[in-house]
Amino acid sequence: MRQRFTARAVVVGDRAGTVVPDAVVDVRDGVIEWVGPSSEAPEQGDADVVALPGVLTPGLVNAHSHAPMVLFRGQGEGLPLDRWLQEVMWPREARLTPEDVEVAMTAASAEMLGNGITTSVEMYFHPERIAAAVGVTGARAVIATPLLPLPGMPPMEEQLRTAVALAIGAPDDGSVEYGLGPHAAYTVPLPVLRDAAAAAREHGLLLHLHVAETATEGDDLLAAHGLSVPSLLAAHDVLGGRVLAAHCVHMDDGDLDLWQEYDVAVAHCPASNAKLASGVIRLRDMLDRGIRVGLGTDGPASNDSLDLLADQRLAAGMARLRERSATALTAAEAFWLATGAAADAIGRPDLGVLEAGRRADLVHVDTRDLVFEPVGDLADLLAHLVWSADGRHVRDVWVGGAQVVRDGASTRVDAGALRADVAARAARLATG
């Protein structure tokens, strides 16, 4: 199937912030064939034409999420991370059923698609139910099966064996990919972390874990082992291969040197870090060292939205405040962190940028709104996309060339029915 998308402009999703005016994107069988100005476009031929009045962008890539936690949105308000987990989240999660997770993920996936997020890295229970949910909504997911020693869960060694078997047995079609998700060095025994990392390297899987999210985490592990969190992971052979570390807030120069040495990627979650008062990462230092970074929402219970367009604005603002410099993160870099950089961080070079050979995950942002005025040059469009727009301005979304959002609504699921179902399940989980 051939498709031709025409738009006011295309925002490519590269680090340079390339914007192509009066643009064409040609797609064949779900893969981009050509991108450029309409004046240089190849012959249209028999392509189905989709004419769009706004801006076309890559599908956003959410580098860290626990999306089924829409069941717990807003709960535990005002608590720091340790109390938030122990007093509010984990007791509710102990009552979760597989069906709860699938319904919640379906609702959350539809919400993310409506905000322009076409791919998310998920770490949550019942990974096969998460896969089933995105199969319904039409999204993509990289699912890091959680490894965590919680009551009622199998022994850690059994969890790891099951997670590896699930990952290596999954179809390689680009829609759902499984990885390994040992929660963190403060919750998972170090030998299990080491074994999970070895398995991930052996099979080419994503290893996804939380690192240095809070000062308390770092202080406790330093007291117990005499090492920072990154140094502890390096000492136990956890680094190397395809590692994606979420948060990475409390990192000194030596820690950043390790990340650079082992090519560890970072999932930066500014909204969650701000809400839970975890801290502000050294984003400029990471980028200047060549450390791969992608934006993540974290879970909707600690963000509390699933809107990367809003989070890119927060990431830019926090970086500028930290460095006291209005150039600490440019608009082009902020958008790149949610697109091309995020795809690179999660190890998916087939996503995140509008260029030939990548999958046709496309987002139409309606620019017929006051927040997109004035436009003196192409840089203004990108600046408005970062500093003024949010998920409300997403009108249409395609994943692999298939439309999954039309005029702001899912083409696959009934959002109203899902909302009611999530509300009922959340009430049950809150009361036991």
Task: Give the location of each predicted region.
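Active-site microenvironment of metallo-dependent hydrolases
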Residues: 1-23, 28-29, 338-432
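Divalent metal-coordination and catalytic microenvironments
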Residues: 8, 25, 30, 53, ...
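Alpha-helical scaffold segments that flank or form the walls of functional sites
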Residues: 55, 73-138, 161-172, 423-427, ...
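Active-site gating loops and adjacent loop-to-helix segments of metal-dependent hydrolytic enzymes
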Residues: 71-103, 137-152, 157, 164, ...
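Metal-coordinating catalytic core of metallo-dependent amide/deamination hydrolases
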Residues: 129-249, 254
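Histidine/acidic-residue-rich catalytic or RNA/ligand-binding cores of hydrolases
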Residues: 215-227, 255-260, 277-286, 303-320, ...
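His/Asp/Glu-enriched, well-ordered alpha-helical/loop segment
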Residues: 235-242, 284-371
